[in-house]
């Protein structure tokens, strides 16, 4: 599997049974969704083989690689899910109502609190009083 990104050959080292180095997230961001899913399948397959070897106790050297592969799976899933969420945000930006998981994460009090427009609103009586009775200005005689 050889992919050319920005005139550099990347991921030739990421073939099955060869996940020895850390996976770099900035390299993953350049990949398409199909490539990410393919890489995810390869990683999960690799993880399954490592777990089998752990149970059968055939390769003790492979035990340390389990954490690397697990973290690589998490990185691929994170990049993929972030991309999907951004696409959903763009889709719902024009619409008046957005799903709860795309809204900003706030505390319950801030979610239930009044908006700035509601805070600045005045009753009719307050408006009339402000109009007809301006603030008094006092001059002090020195």
UniProtKB/Swiss-Prot annotation:
Record bears the keyword Ribonucleoprotein: yes
Gene3D superfamilies: 1.10.287.310, 6.10.250.3450
InterPro entries per the UniProt record, alphabetical: Ribosomal_uL29, Ribosomal_uL29_euk, Ribosomal_uL29_sf
NCBIfam families: L29 (TIGR00012)
Family: Belongs to the universal ribosomal protein uL29 family.
Name under which the protein is recorded: Large ribosomal subunit protein uL29
Gene name linked to the record: RPL35
Record keywords: Ribonucleoprotein, Ribosomal protein
Bilayer-spanning residue ranges: none
One Pfam family recorded for the sequence: Ribosomal_L29
GO terms under cellular component: cytosolic large ribosomal subunit
GO MF assignments: mRNA binding; structural constituent of ribosome
GO annotation terms (biological process): maturation of LSU-rRNA from tricistronic rRNA transcript (SSU-rRNA, 5.8S rRNA, LSU-rRNA); translation
């Amino acid at each position: 599997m050889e992919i050319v990104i920005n005139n550099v050959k990347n991921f030739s080292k990421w073939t099955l049974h060869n996940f020895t180095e850390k996976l770099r997230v900035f390299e993953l961001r350049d990949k398409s969704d199909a490539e990410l899913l393919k890489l995810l399948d390869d990683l999960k397959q690799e993880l399954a083989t490592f777990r089998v070897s752990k149970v059968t106790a055939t390769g003790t050297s492979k035990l340390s690689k389990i954490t690397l592969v697990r973290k690589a799976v998490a990185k691929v899933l994170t990049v993929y899910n972030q991309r999907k969420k951004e696409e959903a945000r763009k889709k719902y930006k024009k619409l008046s109502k957005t799903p709860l998981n795309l809204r900003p994460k706030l505390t319950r009090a801030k979610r239930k609190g009044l908006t700035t427009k509601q805070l600045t609103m005045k009753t009719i009586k307050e408006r009339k009083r402000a109009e007809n009775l301006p603030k008094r200005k006092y001059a002090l005689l020195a």
